[in-house]
Amino acid sequence: MEREKFGSRLGFILISAGCAIGIGNVWRFPYVAGNNGGGIFVLLYMLFLLMFGIPVLSMELAMGRASKSSIIRAYHELERPGQKWHIHGYLGMIGNYILLFFYTTVSGWMLGYFIKYVTGDITKNTDSSQMFADVIANPWIMFVWMAVIVLIAVIVCSMGLQNGVEKITKYMMLILLGLIIILAIHSLTLDGAGKGMKYFLVPDMNKIEEVGFGNIIIEAMRQAFFTLSVGMGSMMIFGSYIGKERALVGEGIQITLLDTFVAIMSGVIIFPACMSYNIPTDSGPSLIFVTLPKVFEHMSGGRFWGAMFFLFMTFAALSTVIAVLENII
């Protein structure tokens, strides 16, 4: 039986970018950039993407294309007799499972918050800190939303590569990109936009001296590897679905550009909004589920913008869940 292939180059790029684009682009990259010298961090990050990220990504795609398999079988297919490279395949698959456990849970939170904004459960008088604490304290609510995400991902993957994974992820990613552009434009119209963009992108020499240039280099390198989801072999499965007529380095560059665009736009959304309402930025879950709801409380049409933001986040997380699940199965 002939192995399925992507129906279009756009489908391949969008689903591969969907695997790379995730919550780390939103709740980690802007905060780390702002706290590590702003523009200097962004420049170093892009340099390391060029030096290490794109070559490693291209290598994973090449291994997938050469073996026509996902990570475990790929190493068995490509290694020479007596070699032990397949051990990394098993370690990589364990990493994919851990990533899936994490993402299905957090994706459920995103979906739950989107529905809360749509139904009006979140208002200007809502205590965002207490609301998030209540969500964490209720395992049944978390289980229900996680189960919904898992069910959606399983249904999409069961529909096959072209009719399921490629088709649905392509629409999700196009909507995601549209949403992030709309949200970024809105943030740039706020009063604190200039101050926020300066904090995010202009090199801060005082911050560089405070943090240390060596530490900034390490953080930029860490983010470059983290953002592309390389190292666990999650990109191999997508390489296995493309033909030899594709230039893998070129495809890797396209994927990296999309991932970087979302990371930069996330900073454009977050910093102007936080600076406009004098709300300190944070990282991790507290940024998404505590800090930003406070921003939306102060914002005109906050319920609408909150719903749009959490729809964007749900698509970003769900695209990764679908991609990782496709790699596992």
Language model regions located:
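Membrane-interface "cap" regions at the ends of multi-pass membrane proteins
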Residues: M1-W27, V56-L61, R65-Y90, G243-A247
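Membrane-embedded translocation segments of transport machinery
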Residues: E2-F6, E166, K170-L318, I322
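Inter-helical loop and helix-membrane interface segments of multi-pass membrane transporters/permeases
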Residues: R3-E4, V32-N36, A66-L91, T104-Q162, ...
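Extracellular loop-to-transmembrane helix junctions
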Residues: E4, A33-M59, I141-M142, V262
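Transmembrane helix-boundary motif of multi-pass solute transporters/channels
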Residues: L10-F48, G233-G239, G250-I253, L257-T260, ...
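Alpha-helical transmembrane segments and their helix-start/interface "positive-inside/aromatic belt" motifs
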Residues: G11, G38-M46, Q83-F101, E166-L176, ...
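Central hydrophobic cores of alpha-helical transmembrane segments in multi-pass inner-membrane proteins
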Residues: G24, L44, L49-L61, I71-R73, ...
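Hydrophobic core segments of alpha-helical transmembrane domains in multi-pass membrane transport
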Residues: Y45-I54, M93-V118, W145-M159, L174-S187, ...
